[in-house]
Curated annotation (Swiss-Prot):
This is DNA repair protein RecO. SUPFAM superfamilies: ArfGap/RecO-like zinc finger, Nucleic acid-binding proteins. InterPro entries: ARFGAP/RecO, DNA_rep/recomb_RecO_N, NA-bd_OB-fold, RecO, RecO_C. GO terms for biological process: DNA recombination; double-strand break repair. It comes from the Bacteria. Gene3D superfamilies: Nucleic acid-binding proteins (2.40.50.140), Recombination protein O, C-terminal domain (1.20.1440.120). It holds the Pfam family RecO_N. Transmembrane segments: none annotated. Involved in DNA repair and RecF pathway recombination. One of its GO terms (cellular component) is bacterial nucleoid. Keywords: DNA damage, DNA recombination, DNA repair. Signal peptide: none annotated.
Length: 279
């Protein structure tokens, strides 16, 4: 066992361990994924208290162990309490946290992903349901970008030709390939599914509005817009389009992860059919 060490980390997952401990999955900015024992953290008199709660950022002092390292001391840096004001913002945060947990690994620092995730959680605080959805989708796009698997929106992944999107919604459709990692022109000999995943490649159709939104989110200027300016510009796209693009990204993520995500179905219950039909 080595010396104690210090790191900044955010709690992504917690589970009971033994009679009184918790096992935390912590995303450390400079160490990647850490599995840490939070000793005696399940008791009412725990000195760690709320420091082991979900999405709390702590300055941690850690003692290396033979199998698992142990938290000696934790000083809270951020808590994101505004996530708990409504179900949609909390669900969006849990959605992002689940995806991030799949992207991180022990001893592999990802400071850009850490900063992006924390910034997105901060933007979600106090957001309306519609705003939370837009922030979530932008957050997912950033995670995909930092993971090196961002979809291609501006050119056909098969031919390399640039995509010209109509300014108004028509019967125009574009294909989206999960295996190919982006959009493609639909051919008569290449049938594409609509809402459901079709074929081994997981292809589906996108409308002009969905492609325009994907292209807008892929722009570097959009990725780093301040929260209020981003939400103002996001109003140009109907709620139904945001919901549709979220499902595309969800399926795309699940295709690459080769397993279903647990949290996203909870997001569906946050939006009633009546709300989805409104712009």
């Amino acid at each position: 066992m080595g010396r104690t060490y210090r790191t900044i980390g955010i709690n992504l997952k917690a589970m009971p361990l033994g009679e009184s401990d918790r096992l935390l999955s912590v995303f450390s900015r400079d160490r990647g994924l850490l599995k840490l024992v939070a000793p005696h953290s399940r008791g009412s008199r725990s000195r760690l208290g709320g420091r082991v709660d979900l999405f709390v950022v702590n300055d941690l002092f850690i003692s290396p162990g033979r199998n698992l390292d142990r938290i000696l001391q934790a000083e809270t840096v951020a808590t994101y309490q505004g996530l708990h004001h409504q179900l949609t913002t909390l669900t969006a945060a849990q959605y992002l946290g689940e995806v991030v947990l799949y992207q991180i690994h022990p001893q592999q620092p990802q400071p850009e992903l850490f900063d992006w995730f924390c910034a997105t959680l901060d933007q979600l605080q106090g957001a309306s349901s519609r705003a939370a959805l837009a922030i979530l989708v932008r957050g997912l796009c950033g995670i995909l970008r930092l993971g090196g698997i961002a979809p291609e929106w501006y050119q056909c992944h098969e031919s390399g030709c640039k995509i010209a999107v109509p300014t108004a919604d028509t019967d125009w459709r574009l294909g989206f390939s999960f295996a190919g990692g982006g959009v493609f022109r639909i051919r008569a000999d290449h049938p594409v599914g609509n809402e459901s995943v079709a074929g081994a490649g997981g292809d589906r159709q996108l409308t002009a509005s969905e492609v325009r939104l994907g292209q807008w989110l892929a722009m570097p200027t959009t990725q780093f817009l301040a929260r209020d300016e981003f939400l103002t510009q996001a109003e140009a796209y109907p709620l139904s389009v945001w919901l549709s693009l979220e499902r595309v990204l969800r399926q795309y993520l699940q295709f690459h992860l080769e397993q279903p995500l647990r949290v996203p179905p909870l997001l569906d219950s946050c939006f009633s059919p009546v709300a989805v039909s409104q712009p």
